[in-house]
Design a protein with these regions (language model features):
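Conserved catalytic core of the tyrosine transesterase superfamily
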Residues: 1-274
Length: 274
């Protein structure tokens, strides 16, 4: 996208960044708004914000434009279906825990199911993050940089213990989850967790996708459905604000039914309502 921005500047007669001001940046964003969806405009804003932060730090621009990119973009919020509890149970039960791979994969799926950890936090989890005496898992979330202390529940603890003692290869890396095949190094990226989740779905005969986040979403919905406020869920999940937690309200069907209005007193138009 920065390439398109520079190409647009050339079309406007600029040969370098000198002379480009706030009015030109705003004009580019307005031009983009005529062709791109709000979600794309949101990304363009972030790209330009990082670009100008770099240019300002490098002394290529005299002005700090960070405030210029502080505007909010109203993006369409998608409501993803919630993975049923029966499907989650089937997914976990299908994993063959007699193998090294099964022990590792089961422990990872349990962290997502019971504690709602993101894939990026699962692969970053270190042996030193586990406090067995206190029964705690200490995580500095990759997405928010928020430190979170989670309970090391018995089921999660048993899954981790089984993998660490009976499956995890000896390695220099301190990360808990390692590659099955040599070299036994840490998992390269969060997408690997998504691929493992996909394979588990295939084995369980469930709809196939790579959204390990489905487990976090299912837990969030379960908490809200059981009367936990979105503010408390945000604290449990380590979210910076409730905006990340509010979508769980949209999947709480039972409580949404209580908010539905009846058609009593509303005269039908164009025929009777069936």
């Amino acid at each position: 996208m920065t390439y398109k921005y520079f190409a647009w500047l050339e079309e406007q007669g600029f040969r370098d960044i000198a002379g480009v001001g706030a009015i030109h940046i705003q004009k580019f964003l307005l031009a983009c708004s005529e062709h791109y969806a709000p979600s794309t405009i949101h990304d363009i804003r972030l790209y330009l914000k990082k670009l100008y932060a770099f240019l300002y730090a490098a002394g290529q621009t005299e002005d700090d434009y960070s405030a210029l990119f502080s505007f909010a973009v109203n993006r369409e919020k998608r409501v993803f279906p919630v993975l049923p509890k029966a499907d989650i149970a089937k997914l976990l039960d299908t994993i063959d825990r007699s193998t090294v791979k099964g022990k590792r994969d089961y422990a990872m799926m349990m962290l997502g199911t019971v504690l709602g950890l993101r894939a990026c936090d699962v692969i970053a989890l270190k042996l030193t993050d586990l406090d067995w005496l206190r029964g705690e898992i200490r995580v500095v979330q990759s997405k928010t940089s928020n430190p979170v202390i989670l309970p090391l529940t018995q089921d999660v603890g048993e899954a981790l213990k089984d993998y660490i003692l009976n499956g995890r290869p000896s390695a220099v890396d301190s990360e808990i989850f390692l590659r099955i095949n040599a070299p036994h190094t840490k998992l390269a990226a969060a997408v690997t967790v998504g691929e493992i989740y996909r394979d588990c779905c295939i084995a369980a005969g469930l709809p196939v996708n790579k959204r390990f986040h489905n487990l976090r979403r299912a837990l969030g919905t379960s908490l809200v459905t059981n009367g936990i406020s979105v503010y408390d869920v945000a604290q449990i999940f380590g979210d910076k604000n409730v905006n990340s937690t509010k979508p769980y309200l949209a999947t709480d069907v039972e409580h949404l039914k209580m908010c539905a209005l009846s058609f009593a007193g509303i005269a039908p138009v164009g025929g009777d309502l069936q």
